[in-house]
A protein has these predicted regions:
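Structural helix-boundary/capping segments
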Residues: 1-13, 76-80, 87, 136-170
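Gly/Ser-rich, acidic/histidine-flanked active-site/gating loops
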Residues: 1-34, 69
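Short helix-loop capping/hinge segments that flank enzyme active sites or metal/cofactor-binding pockets
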Residues: 35-90, 143-153
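Short, surface-exposed loop/helix-turn segments at secondary-structure junctions
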Residues: 77, 108-128
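Small-aliphatic-rich amphipathic alpha-helix that forms the alpha element of a beta-alpha
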Residues: 90, 121-144
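An anion/phosphate-binding loop that grips the pyrophosphate of nucleotide cofactors and donors
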Residues: 96
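Short glycine-/small-residue-rich Rossmann-like dinucleotide-binding loops
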Residues: 104
Length: 170
């Protein structure tokens, strides 16, 4: 609903808005989770264990329970695959320089949903695939509020070409 509402606003403002099939967002999000997890485990977790609150330590524990993170060999393959995914997106964005996408695939969750349960944090990551996945392939995105949906504030994001943040912000 948020994307449709934003598309209407953009169309009313004179922008050409058309449906398009993008490269896989889901594959990018899964890769982000698996390979960023390896970086978190190696570099951030020692600090979180030493200095982090019980809440943040629990959130990280649930994060690592959600799936397997990469070992060093798998991580190198993941970085290689990231280059291929980035290329697919770059090629797509040559003809479609901006993409209107949801920020969450569900209504905005409670502010503390990631602190409540493994299921809650899983729901957040599963519904935020456009954010995490496109972060994995280093695409700029601007998030903007679109109003209230289902009694919650909602937003969309405009995704652009690499190094063309100016187009996202225009």
């Amino acid at each position: 609903e948020a994307v449709d509402r934003a598309a209407g606003y953009l169309s009313d403002a004179g922008y050409a808005v058309a449906a398009a099939t993008t490269p896989s967002v889901d594959d990018c999000a899964k890769a982000w989770f698996r390979y960023l997890g390896a970086e978190l485990e190696a570099f951030l977790m020692p600090l979180a264990r030493e200095h982090g609150s019980e809440t943040i330590q629990q959130i990280f524990e649930w994060y690592f329970e959600m799936g397997k993170t990469a070992d060093p060999v798998d991580y190198r393959l993941g970085v290689k695959n990231r280059s291929a995914m980035t290329r697919q997106w770059n090629e797509f964005l040559q003809d479609t320089p901006l993409v209107l996408a949801p920020y969450f695939l569900q209504p905005t969750p409670d502010w503390d949903c990631d602190q409540k349960s493994l299921a809650g944090i899983r729901d957040v990551f599963n519904s935020a695939i456009y954010s995490t996945g496109l972060n994995w392939v280093s695409l700029p995105a601007g998030v903007t509020p679109i109003g209230m949906i289902a009694g919650r504030p909602a937003g969309v994001q405009i995704i652009g070409r690499r190094y063309r943040e100016d187009m996202v912000l225009d």
